[in-house]
């Protein structure tokens, strides 16, 4: 019973942060699973694929809850969200099957490199105007952005989401902020919708392959549903600049840890 309660609390925390920044929360869950819950450190998971599949299920729960919250707030730019979401589907499906080919050390190294890169980009850009653009100064009806580039990036977001179990928002939000010029609150809400759609395909493929451990997945997912509602409310009232800076540092440090773990596992040190 205590273990189930711990899963629920973990889900609430992950869901709150994930919806607040439009990142899904998988980037928090995967390191926790890998460091404490997979053999030889724990007994919940036995393979990396189970870590990814279970994490992605929690991301799905977080994203669907956050999507409904942001729809009520009218923060989702649907003319971007729908094509971006559709573009993630083939990438997510492909990633779900290619995840079978990732070994433990190789997975850790690739995941770490991705985390370090994203952490650096988020920190270097967080002090600029793009990260602090006001919704009031941006008209969604007339705003122009590079749709083909957004669609192309979204395909790779879906692929990364399913491969790494991180939801893809950790790539999508910076892209919408710093490449397409969306205000932070619009980028977060739109990313949450895209995560929901891409996670459907990713979760489906992982479920068919038996990669989801349903006990922890359901409890963490339930917590993520609750946390996403809290995160969406906080996002509506707050400026995410400080959170983005702190989060970028955390992502960078976790990435370094996974790079070291992967390199040691591959016999480089």
Where are these regions (language model features)?
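A short glycine-/small-residue-rich loop at the edge of a beta-strand within enzyme catalytic domains
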Residues: 143, 166-167, 191
């Amino acid at each position: 019973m205590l273990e189930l309660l711990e899963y629920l609390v973990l889900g609430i925390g992950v869901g709150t942060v994930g919806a607040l920044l439009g990142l899904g929360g998988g980037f928090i869950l995967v390191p926790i699973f890998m460091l404490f819950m997979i053999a030889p450190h724990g007994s919940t998971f036995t393979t990396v694929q189970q870590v990814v599949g279970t994490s992605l299920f929690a991301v799905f729960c977080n994203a669907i809850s956050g999507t409904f919250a942001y729809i009520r707030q009218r923060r989702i730019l649907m003319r971007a969200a729908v094509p971006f979401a559709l573009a993630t589907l083939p990438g997510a499906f492909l990633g779900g099957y290619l995840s079978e080919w990732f070994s433990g050390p190789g997975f850790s190294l690739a995941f770490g490199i991705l985390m370090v890169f994203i952490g650096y980009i988020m920190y270097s850009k967080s002090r600029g105007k793009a990260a602090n653009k006001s919704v009031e100064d941006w008209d969604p009806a007339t705003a122009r952005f590079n749709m083909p580039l957004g669609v192309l990036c979204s395909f790779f977001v879906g692929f990364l989401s399913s491969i790494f179990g991180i939801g893809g928002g950790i790539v999508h939000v910076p892209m919408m902020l710093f490449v397409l010029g969306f205000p932070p609150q619009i980028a977060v809400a739109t990313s949450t919708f895209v995560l929901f759609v891409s996670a459907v395909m990713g979760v489906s493929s992982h479920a068919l392959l038996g990669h989801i451990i349903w006990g922890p997945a359901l409890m963490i997912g339930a917590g993520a549903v609750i946390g996403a509602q809290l995160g969406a409310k906080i996002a509506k009232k707050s400026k995410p600049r400080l959170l983005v800076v702190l989060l970028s540092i955390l992502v960078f440090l976790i990435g370094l840890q996974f790079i070291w773990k992967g390199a040691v596992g591959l016999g480089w040190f």
